[in-house]
């Protein structure tokens, strides 16, 4: 596992369905990655679902147009067997001399799993994911033939060349730790366990205390809206994610979701829209996004982030950082953080 002295920030690349056409999508994907490089963001999460382009293909274009940007690629086991994923990692690191990080997912949308004939129950999906990561690590780390026999994957004396040229190019593996099975698997197999955090006390009780003492790092996925004044920030937040009836209906449905993080966020949103004057569930309540938002002036948001860092958070996956203005405002927040990149 890895040890970090500084906080690692990742942005995200929106799906192609957010844009009017190929040209607009690619121009914006590259622009976001280049802004990430310019403003000290490690890399960007590229999503996987049935409505977006393949994240490996998108990342290959982005890497050609950036110098340091590290893709954080959502990896769904039914899409790529571990051998294929390992070969892609090997090829990307060889061609670009750059790391590829992985966000291991099991799938929060039951319908997509059923469509591919890959549906298995929640607990079994994490058992399969654990095996997947074991095989992936064996392939990337072993300098001799690899054999493995599990319930889902089998390798027989497999030769896998060439080796990654430098240990610094080994992928950092992120995994959701919102459910009990996810957290248990992440603590055994990942470098980072990720959650959509609750407000500080909730996060401490339900997540950070369970991770403390392990070699695995904590990561959170959150959006930030910060401005010179809290009044400005809240005005922007409400304009970006206005209340609507459909969102409220969907919110109650999410309390019955198979996804534990969807249920948790829905329950928090139903209990209160705002916590600690900064932690806002309005974007999730209204169906606009799938994460909480920190809203306030630069000092308020920086202070709240610092409290997460005191609870052991070492990586932040930032939502909706799509323009240079977004990066500038986040840079102002970072100025008030006690352990900046």
Swiss-Prot record:
What is the name of this protein?
4-(gamma-L-glutamylamino)butanoyl-[BtrI acyl-carrier protein] monooxygenase BtrO
Q: List the disulfide bonds.
A: none
Question: What is the reaction catalyzed?
Answer: 4-(gamma-L-glutamylamino)butanoyl-[BtrI ACP] + FMNH2 + O2 = 4-(gamma-L-glutamylamino)-(2S)-2-hydroxybutanoyl-[BtrI ACP] + FMN + H2O + H(+)
**Keyword field:** Antibiotic biosynthesis, Flavoprotein, FMN, Monooxygenase, Oxidoreductase
The molecular function terms of the Gene Ontology recorded here are: alkanesulfonate monooxygenase activity; oxidoreductase activity, acting on paired donors, with incorporation or reduction of molecular oxygen, reduced flavin or flavoprotein as one donor, and incorporation of one atom of oxygen
UniProt-listed Pfam families: Bac_luciferase (PF00296)
Kindly report, in one word, the top-level EC class recorded for this enzyme: oxidoreductase
GO BP: alkanesulfonate catabolic process; antibiotic biosynthetic process
* Family matches, as InterPro entries: Luciferase-like_dom (IPR011251), Luciferase-like_sf (IPR036661), SsuD_RutA_monooxygenase (IPR050172)
Q: Which family does it belong to?
A: Belongs to the bacterial luciferase oxidoreductase family.
**What EC number(s) are associated with this protein in UniProt?**
1.14.14.13
* Function field: Monooxygenase component of a two-component system involved in the biosynthesis of the side chain of the aminoglycoside antibiotics in the biosynthetic pathway of butirosin. Together with BtrV, mediates hydroxylation of gamma-L-Glu-GABA-S-BtrI. Not able to hydroxylate free substrates, activation by the acyl-carrier protein is mandatory. Octanoyl-S-[BtrI acyl-carrier protein] is also accepted as substrate.
Indicate whether Magnesium appears among the record's keywords: no
| Pathway annotation from the record | Antibiotic biosynthesis; butirosin biosynthesis
């Amino acid at each position: 596992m890895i040890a970090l002295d500084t906080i690692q920030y990742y942005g995200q690349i929106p799906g192609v369905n957010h844009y009017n056409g190929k040209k607009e999508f690619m121009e914006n994907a590259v622009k976001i990655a280049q802004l990430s490089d310019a403003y000290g963001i490690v890399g960007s999460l590229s999503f996987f679902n049935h409505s977006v382009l393949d994240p490996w293909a998108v990342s290959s274009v982005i890497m050609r147009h950036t110098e340091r940007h590290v893709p954080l690629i959502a990896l769904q086991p039914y899409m790529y067997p571990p051998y294929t994923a390992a070969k892609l990692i090997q090829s990307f690191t060889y061609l670009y001399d750059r790391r590829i990080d992985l966000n291991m997912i099991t799938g929060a949308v039951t319908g997509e799993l059923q469509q591919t004939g890959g549906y298995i129950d929640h607990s079994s999906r994490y058992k399969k994911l654990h095996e997947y990561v074991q095989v992936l690590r064996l392939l990337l780390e072993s300098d001799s033939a690899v054999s493995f026999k599990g319930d889902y994957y089998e390798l027989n004396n497999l030769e896998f060349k060439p080796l990654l040229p430098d240990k610094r190019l080994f992928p950092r593996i992120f995994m959701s730790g919102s459910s009990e099975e996810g957290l248990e698997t992440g603590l055994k197999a990942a470098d980072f366990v990720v959650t959509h955090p609750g407000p500080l006390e909730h996060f401490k009780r339900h997540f950070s205390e369970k991770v403390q003492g392990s070699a695995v790092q904590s990561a959170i996925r959150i959006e930030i809206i910060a401005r010179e004044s809290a009044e400005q920030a809240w005005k922007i937040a409400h304009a970006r994610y206005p209340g609507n009836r459909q969102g409220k209906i969907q919110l109650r449905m999410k309390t019955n979701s198979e996804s534990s993080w969807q249920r948790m966020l829905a329950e928090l949103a139903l209990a209160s829209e705002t916590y600690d004057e900064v932690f806002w569930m309005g974007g999730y309540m209204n169906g606009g996004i799938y994460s909480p938002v920190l809203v306030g002036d630069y000092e308020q948001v920086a202070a709240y982030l610092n409290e997460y860092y005191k609870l052991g958070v070492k990586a932040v996956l930032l939502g909706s950082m799509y323009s240079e203005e977004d990066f500038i405002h986040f840079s102002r927040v970072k100025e008030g953080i006690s352990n900046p990149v």
